[in-house]
Amino acid sequence: IQKAPFAKLASVLGNQASLIQRLSFGVDDRAVEASRRIKSIGDESTYEKDLTEPADIDRQIAIHSDVVAKRLRRHKLAGRTISLKVRFASFRTVTRSLSLEEGTDLQEEIYAAALELKKRIYMNEGVRLIGVTASNLAPPLETVDLFSTVREKQVKAAAVMDAIQEKFGEHALRKGFWLEEEKRKEMEEKEKENKEAPEEE
């Protein structure tokens, strides 16, 4: 996007082309409208079929981290405390939290914190529910000049993705774990249909 000719971007993105190209360079001059009344932002799901595979559990944590990060950015907020909630098949519910050195609105950082919290939970049975929450909220204080190279790229990528999804919809550009989740749901649906299908005599 940074190297693309503006005319070509405009033909695809329309009026949003200038904004999206500026965001790709880390320039965001939109007004900050943070709500101080919001104390926490979270997302959770209850699963029809208990999750037992570590890869499936981690993918759900990634998805919820992504949803939370998007909501934080939408409200121009960053969360310093990250919490992971896990409910097992036995309805045993465990919540763990940790505080970061600085607030974040990035999926990658929220996900990393949630995975660290998962290590503190005894995962000895199927998982019925997973939730990720960010609290201790405040407007982001960082400036792009202070970011590490990796974090700067993550910030720019998140801004570009937000702008594209805002214009073209959530499915216009998605991270890989969302696509993997869609495949998992399709497989579950097929298994359900096969079980419900009448047996041939």
Where are these regions (language model features)?
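DNA-contacting surface of Y-family translesion DNA polymerases
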Residues: 2-126
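Acidic, metal-coordinating catalytic segment for phosphate/diphosphate chemistry
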Residues: 102-201
